[in-house]
Design a protein with these regions (language model features):
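Bacterial N-terminal signal peptides that target proteins for export
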Residues: 1-10
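Long, charged/polar, surface-exposed segments that mediate recognition or autoinhibition
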Residues: 101-152
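Short loop/beta submotifs within extracellular cysteine-rich repeat domains
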Residues: 43-47, 84-86, 136-144, 181, ...
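Exposed beta-strand-loop-beta-strand "reactive/processing" segments of non-cytosolic proteins
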Residues: 51-90, 157-193
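A short, surface-exposed interaction/processing loop segment used at functional sites
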Residues: 95-121, 185-204
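C-terminal motif of bacterial Sec signal peptides marking the signal peptidase cleavage site
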Residues: 18-21
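Bacterial signal peptide processing site
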Residues: 23-25
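Short glycine-rich, low-complexity/disordered patches
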Residues: 29-37, 41-69, 138-168
């Protein structure tokens, strides 16, 4: 079971975009098989899956020069180690290569490695992303004046399973709704739409 949320962003400038990704040496798109394979490769390279549990995976398109071009630019990974420490790792596109920063440790909370449920990366695939985008698009098209807009890009995909805080592990056995909430993968994504009659943005 996947709980799904999405946000619509209406923007006023038009730029070229591709929703399925690129091939060869061109930038990776947001939702192609090639992109997802690269994301998983980067995650597994930078996070030891045998020593850590990943509970969050997010990737975003470029928000600068290539905004709305559906170009993969950053990946964020949330994970817990066996000492119940929580980390965030950001992998960013720099000069054509993805570079991992230093993991940022959460000094406020500790999460139970043993009781938290890890994301299954195999559950995240291009078919799922296409289904999510289609459902979000179809829902947007039921809104008033929706035909005045075109879908230009996906700004973000996020998948996560709520990690269990240390001290709350007992609730998994005592509360069925708590167990369901903390073992269910949640998906979230942003769709960017532009108004059809807006003039293209000129870049110099």
């Amino acid at each position: 079971m996947i709980r799904q949320f999405f946000k619509v962003t209406l923007v006023v400038s038009m730029v070229a975009s591709v929703l399925v990704g690129c091939n060869g040496s061109e930038p990776l798109g947001m939702g192609s098989e090639e992109s997802i394979s690269k994301i998983k490769e980067l995650v597994k390279t930078n996070v030891d899956m045998n020593e850590n549990k990943i509970y969050e995976l997010q990737w975003e398109e470029d928000n600068g020069e290539h905004k709305l071009e559906n170009m993969l630019s950053s990946i964020t990974v949330g994970y817990i180690d066996k000492e119940n420490n929580d980390y965030k790792l950001i992998i960013e596109l720099k000069d054509g290569e993805f570079v991992a920063g230093e993991p940022d440790k959460n000094e406020k909370w500790k999460y139970s490695y043993e009781k938290s449920t890890a994301l299954n990366l195999d559950d995240i695939n291009a078919g799922l992303l296409k289904k999510m985008v289609k459902e979000g698009y179809d829902l947007f098209m039921t809104q008033e004046d929706s035909t005045q807009y075109d879908l230009k890009s996906v700004g973000k995909y996020r998948f996560y399973i709520y990690p269990v805080k240390v001290g709350r592990e007992h609730l998994l056995a005592e509360n069925e709704s708590f167990k369901k909430e903390y073992t269910t993968m949640v998906s979230y994504f942003d769709l960017n739409f532009i108004k059809k009659d807006e003039a293209p943005e000129v870049r110099g």
